[in-house]
């Protein structure tokens, strides 16, 4: 018998992730603050729950994919939240990019209630979510990770166990740090190509397969050139992630000048009204 999965948060990525689980035959209970966002998956057979509490009482596995650490805190620790209402033995998987310290707090609270918690942030954007090819980095108890592997495999391809609670979130910070300065490089390269009189699309054919090649160059540079700034990943969420990484680095006594520069440029972009655009909209700082 298939486990009942509860999915909280049906944004740009969450909706696709939940759909893969539903398509595998699992009963899927859903909750999101704006019910309209759930309409398409409800039409496919997902079951709407009016509150986090109602969902938590019925699900064997509860997956959260919300916006900010404050949202995670509310969903897990509110009086009508997951920790207070999940049934004994349930698996709690937070796939939001959030604070490692919060992941540890959730794991400790879950253990006291005979629940199993994993922090499992993802990378791959809307494309990875739609195709079920996300990279999933997981922290928590190894046995819980292994028990949830069949669920993870419905949403992603590169699924790696990283260590105890908080390790998934720390790994995601490494991911975001690597992307941050890289996105600036991609935008500058495309702006340079255009300014020099080259055909940027043709330039991409040469440089995507060489040493400069990256996911961002292959997937987001074409969107820049097309003027497609729809969010596969929101600017505002990327700024949040970079802020968490800088906070964690400071706690470890580590300086991150490249990350600091990238965040300052994205802050400038957001101040121009682009916080709800995709991260590729950084290109607008160079090309109007």
Curated annotation (Swiss-Prot):
Residues where NAD(+) binds: 6-20, 97, 240
Top-level lineage group: Bacteria
Enzyme active site: 172
EC number: 1.1.-.-
InterPro entries recorded: 3-OH-isobutyrate_DH-rel_CS, 6-PGluconate_DH-like_C_sf, 6PGD_dom2, 6PGDH_NADP-bd, HIBADH-like_NADP-bd, HIBADH-related, NAD(P)-bd_dom_sf
PROSITE patterns noted in UniProt: 3_HYDROXYISOBUT_DH
Record GO cellular component, one term: plasma membrane
UniProt main location, coarse: membrane
GO biological process assignments: organic acid catabolic process
Gene Ontology terms, MF aspect: NAD binding; NADP binding; oxidoreductase activity
Subcellular location: Cell membrane; Membrane raft
Keywords recorded for this protein, A-Z: Cell membrane, Membrane, NAD, Oxidoreductase
Sequence similarity: Belongs to the HIBADH-related family.
Protein name listed in UniProt: Uncharacterized oxidoreductase YkwC
Organism: Bacillus subtilis (strain 168)
Name of the coding gene: ykwC
């Amino acid at each position: 018998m298939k486990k009942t999965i509860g999915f909280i948060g049906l944004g740009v990525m969450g909706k696709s992730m939940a759909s893969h689980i539903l398509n595998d035959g699992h009963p899927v209970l859903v909750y999101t603050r704006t019910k309209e966002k759930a309409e398409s998956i409800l039409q496919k057979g997902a079951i709407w729950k009016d509150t986090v509490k109602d969902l938590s009482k019925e699900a064997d596995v509860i997956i959260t994919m919300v916006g900010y650490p404050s949202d995670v805190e509310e969903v897990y620790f509110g009086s009508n939240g997951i920790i207070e209402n999940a049934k004994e033995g349930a698996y709690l998987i937070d796939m939001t990019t959030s604070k490692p310290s919060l992941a540890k707090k959730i794991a400790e609270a879950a253990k006291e209630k005979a629940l199993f918690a994993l922090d499992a942030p993802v990378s791959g954007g809307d494309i990875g979510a739609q195709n079920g090819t996300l990279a999933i980095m997981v922290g928590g108890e190894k046995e819980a990770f292994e028990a949830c592997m069949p669920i993870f495999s419905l949403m992603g391809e590169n699924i790696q166990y990283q260590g105890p609670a908080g390790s998934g979130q720390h790994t995601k910070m490494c991911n975001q740090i690597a992307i941050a300065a890289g996105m600036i490089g991609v935008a500058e390269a495309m702006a340079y190509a255009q300014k020099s009189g080259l055909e940027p699309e043709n330039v991409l054919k040469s440089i995507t397969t060489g040493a400069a090649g990256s996911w961002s160059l292959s997937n987001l540079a074409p969107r820049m050139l097309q003027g497609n700034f729809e969010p596969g990943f929101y600017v505002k969420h990327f700024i949040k992630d970079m802020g968490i990484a800088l906070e964690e680095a400071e706690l470890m006594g580590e300086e991150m000048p490249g990350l600091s520069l990238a965040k300052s440029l994205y802050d400038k972009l957001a101040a121009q009204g682009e916080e709800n655009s995709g991260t590729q909209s950084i290109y607008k700082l160079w090309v109007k």
